[in-house]
Amino acid sequence: MKIGILAIQGSIVEHKNMLERLGVETVLVKKPEHLEIIDGIILPGGESTTFFTILENRLLFDALREKLVNGLPAMGTCAGLILLSSRIENHPDQKTLKVLDITVSRNAYGRQRESFSTYVKIPVIGDREYECIFIRAPQIVEIGRNVKVHATFNDRPIFVEENNILGLTFHPELTDDPRIHEYFLKRCSG
C-alpha cells in the first residue's frame, strides 16, 4: 500500500514519520501524476489559503478533486479539513474541494498562543481516550445528513467521516498514538 501526503506545506514530515512507523510506504504528492500511484492521501495541516493557491498553480486542484470524487480515500487534518469541506463560514467565495459536506469556521479555536490539547473518547478507534492537539484549529459548525460524527469536543464535531473522506479539526500526527492513522489505513485497504 502507498499513501500520498499532499506535500505543499504543513505537517508533512510528521504524517510521513507516523506512516513509516506503521510500515507504510509514502509518496509526497507534488504533481497530478503522483495521484495515479497511491491508495489514499493525507491532506495535512498548514495555512489553508496557501494550500489553495499552490494547488491551483501546480494543476493539482482539479486532478485531486476528480480522484476524491471517484473514491480515493482521504484524511484531512486542520487546514486539510478546510480544503476538503464544502463551505467556509464567512468566506463563501473561497474555493474548496467540496468533497465533505460540512461547513467550517477557520481558526475558530483561537490563535497560535491559544493552542491546546485535550483527551477525547473516539469509539471507532478503541476504548482508550485519544489526545487531540488543536493548533489554530477550524471548527465544524454544520454537517450534512450523510456525515458520521466520530468525536466531539464542547458539543462540536472534531472527527467526521463521509464515504471515503475523513476530516479532523486536530493534529493526530503530533501525538505518538497511531490509532487515527491505523483507522485511515483500514479505509484505504478496502
UniProtKB/Swiss-Prot annotation:
Provide the protein name. Pyridoxal 5'-phosphate synthase subunit PdxT
Please state the gene responsible for encoding this protein: pdxT
InterPro entries to which the protein is assigned, alphabetical = Class_I_gatase-like (IPR029062), PdxT/SNO (IPR002161), PdxT/SNO_CS (IPR021196)
Where does this protein come from, organism-wise? Dictyoglomus thermophilum (strain ATCC 35947 / DSM 3960 / H-6-12)
Q: Self-association or partners: how does it assemble?
A: In the presence of PdxS, forms a dodecamer of heterodimers. Only shows activity in the heterodimer.
What family is reported?
Belongs to the glutaminase PdxT/SNO family.
Keyword Lipid metabolism annotated: no
**What is the role of the protein in this entry?**
Catalyzes the hydrolysis of glutamine to glutamate and ammonia as part of the biosynthesis of pyridoxal 5'-phosphate. The resulting ammonia molecule is channeled to the active site of PdxS.
Superkingdom in the source lineage: Bacteria
- Which residues of the sequence carry a binding annotation for L-glutamine? G46, E47, S48, R106, I135, R136
